[in-house]
């Protein structure tokens, strides 16, 4: 998954290919710290590359509230940091997605940062931060509802 939302092969350019017979398949994907998304119906796949744009709403997705809408673009819900509970976003309570961010930056120093490729990097900017502008904690709170931090957002995969 690239920062612009494209899903490409490991060379960062080629389409993703699967060594499977041509047929109709449900297409699902998930990224390191986002909730997964799946097509609502099977898609015809073959050896010919297919552009499957799930950002416009033209391709229906499985479940309810499977994607976040920003303007007119549909994106994956960000913040699935706590890998103990792989299928939901949760801001408070046991197994929440907020606490691992604090642990990554050093627990006792919430104003610290950690640079690198980490699950806790919700904003995918290469920096994990718990406080301050562009921190990785706030998007989780916003995604679960903002004013109700005890809400849980469940991934829409079977």
Which residues fall in each region the model found?
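Cellulosome-associated attachment modules in secreted, modular CAZymes
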Residues: 1-158
């Amino acid at each position: 998954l690239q920062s612009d939302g494209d899903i490409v092969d490991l060379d960062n350019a080629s389409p993703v290919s699967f060594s499977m017979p041509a047929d109709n398949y449900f297409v699902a994907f998930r990224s390191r710290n986002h909730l997964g998304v799946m097509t609502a119906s099977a898609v015809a796949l073959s050896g010919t590359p297919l552009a499957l744009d799930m950002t416009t709403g033209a391709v229906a997705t499985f479940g309810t509230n499977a994607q976040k809408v920003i303007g007119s673009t549909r994106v994956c819900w960000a913040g699935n940091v706590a890998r103990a509970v792989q299928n939901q976003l949760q801001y408070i309570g046991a197994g929440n997605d907020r606490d691992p961010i604090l642990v990554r930056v050093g627990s006792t120093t919430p104003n610290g940062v950690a640079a690198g490729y980490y699950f806790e990097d919700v904003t995918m900017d290469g920096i994990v931060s718990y406080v301050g502008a562009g921190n990785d904690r706030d998007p989780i709170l916003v995604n679960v509802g903002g004013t109700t931090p005890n809400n849980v957002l469940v991934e829409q995969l079977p």
